[in-house]
């Protein structure tokens, strides 16, 4: 796809709420990233999928190979290729929220891996609406199967020697969640917090007041060195966002 086509797609179909459109353009123009690294004893890969440049994450214990996939929004075969290349046994597929660009690959990935799907109870109704929602933007997505379990504030999910904590951050959607790995010092923020921006709040269940309040009280209180990996665009840190994010008083 050409750069002009990508610019047109973003500018015409995704409103520039809180700078998100510009953030997405930067992601897409960088091309389809598929980056991998080991963070201590953990395999960590970012797989950019779909025309909206969603960051899908593969996390796994480097010894036991138990792992999770977060937000397989599209291009399930690309996600499954990363799973296979790393020899990962996927225990769970987690959705940060239920918007179509983050859930479009749920069905294929869960069917191929046998992983249990998890999403918040508030956002679960979106799972059966992905195809219809995508057509509103001239795109396509598969409806998702129902979840095996619901995510809620304070839940802990283990894979190998690693553990993530669920943090409920409403505002981009009613049931938006972030995933915090304290030992590894990283946060998967979905579409709640971006590099020097926040998620759009003009969709059903959205509220800028709720979103900003939750980010300030639940995310900006994490250690400043915590690395933040958002649903679109480049990584950042809690310290950087406290200082420079204009939507958070930075």
Q: Each predicted region: which residue ranges?
A:
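Bacterial N-terminal signal peptides
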Residues: 18-27
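Short, glycine/acidic-enriched loop or turn micro-motifs at the edges of active sites
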Residues: 64, 74, 100, 123, ...
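Metallo-beta-lactamase
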Residues: 88, 133, 162-250
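Active-site HxH/HxHxD metal-binding segment of metal-dependent hydrolases
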Residues: 74-162, 243-247
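Conserved beta-strand hairpin/beta-sheet module of binuclear metal-dependent hydrolase folds
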Residues: 39-86, 178-190
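Bacterial N-terminal signal peptides that target proteins for export
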Residues: 3-18
């Amino acid at each position: 796809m050409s750069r002009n086509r990508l610019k047109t797609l973003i500018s015409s179909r995704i409103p520039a709420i809180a700078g998100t459109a510009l953030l997405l353009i930067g992601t897409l123009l960088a091309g389809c990233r598929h980056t991998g690294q080991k963070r201590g004893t953990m395999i960590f890969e970012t797989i950019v999928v779909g025309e909206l440049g969603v960051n899908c994450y593969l996390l796994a214990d480097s010894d036991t190979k138990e792992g999770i996939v977060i937000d397989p929004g599209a291009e399930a075969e690309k996600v499954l290729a990363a799973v296979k290349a790393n020899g990962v046994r996927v225990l769970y597929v987690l959705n940060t929220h239920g918007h179509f660009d983050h859930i479009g690959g749920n069905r294929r990935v869960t069917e191929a891996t046998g992983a249990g799907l998890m999403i918040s109870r508030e956002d679960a109704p979106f799972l059966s609406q992905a195809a219809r929602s995508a057509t509103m933007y001239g795109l396509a997505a598969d409806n998702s199967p129902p979840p095996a379990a619901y995510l809620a504030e304070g839940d802990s999910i283990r894979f190998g020697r690693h553990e993530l904590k669920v943090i409920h951050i409403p505002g981009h959607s009613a049931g938006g969640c972030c995933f915090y790995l304290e030992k590894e010092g990283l946060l998967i923020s979905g579409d709640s917090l971006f590099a020097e921006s926040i998620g759009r709040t003009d969709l059903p269940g959205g509220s800028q007041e709720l979103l900003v309040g939750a980010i300030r009280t639940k995310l900006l209180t994490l250690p400043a060195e915590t690395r933040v990996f958002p649903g679109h665009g480049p990584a950042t840190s809690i310290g950087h966002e406290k200082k420079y994010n204009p939507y958070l008083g930075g």
